[in-house]
Amino acid sequence: EVNASIAGRYYQIGAIRAVTERFESKRREALLVMATGTGKTRTATALVDVMQKAKWAKRILFLVDRRALRDQALSAYKEHLNEPLVYPREGDREFPLDRRVYVQTYHTMLGVVQKQKQYVSPFFFDLIIADEAHRSLFHVFKEIIDYFDALKLGLTATPKDKVHASSYALFNCDKGMPTYEYPYEQAVGDGFLNDFEVLKVR
């Protein structure tokens, strides 16, 4: 059951259910398309909570493309999951093997895969969540995704018709058919986002 205090909006719950149903049907990859500002990180955090409680996933890797997003995600996991076993935390110098939630930039994790394969098994993670999957993955970081034998979830705010075909292929979705979509127009219509106008300044 989804913890509504983490992600209680109807579309967040719908996204989590769509992903878990896909995993239950033995599909090992999923892709969420959610507009910026609709709570992708909260949705991912609530999904981790569901999967850990159901014992579907013990160790989770959350990939981001910038350190600022890494820090934001770390704060979310610590706050909403009361999770002390996260990586990185202050004082960490090496890649530890005793944590439950790992939050890393793609570049840092690529270094781990390339240089520390003897320490990190392909079966180490049970779930990998890739944030901003549209731009950060296919060419440069596909090596990370291919190395680990885990359930995989891509997150992106890019409208589904703008997501590159390679991203759909990476998460085993037909082009234009993400696992779940909550677009900008729907978020505005629901009152969760404010519409905007582009003004030309002369």
Question: What would you call each of these model-derived segments?
Answer:
Residues R67-A68, P88-F95, Y106-G111:
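Conserved helicase motor
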Residues E83-L85, G191:
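Conserved AMP-binding/adenylation subdomain of ANL enzymes
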Residues D65-R66, A157:
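Cofactor-binding loop segments of dinucleotide-utilizing enzymes, especially the Rossmann-like FAD-
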Residues D92-L97, Q186-D190:
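A short acidic, often aromatic-flanked loop/helix-cap motif at beta-alpha or helix-coil junctions
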Residues E1-R59, A68, Q72-E83, L97-V101, ...:
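ATP-dependent helicase/translocase motor core
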Residues L110-R202:
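Signature of the SF2 helicase/ATPase Hel1-core->accessory helical subdomain module
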Residues L47, L74-A76, Y87-G91, K115-Q116, ...:
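Short beta-alpha junctions and helix-cap segments that line functional grooves
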Residues L32, F62-L63, G154:
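Structural beta-sheet core signal
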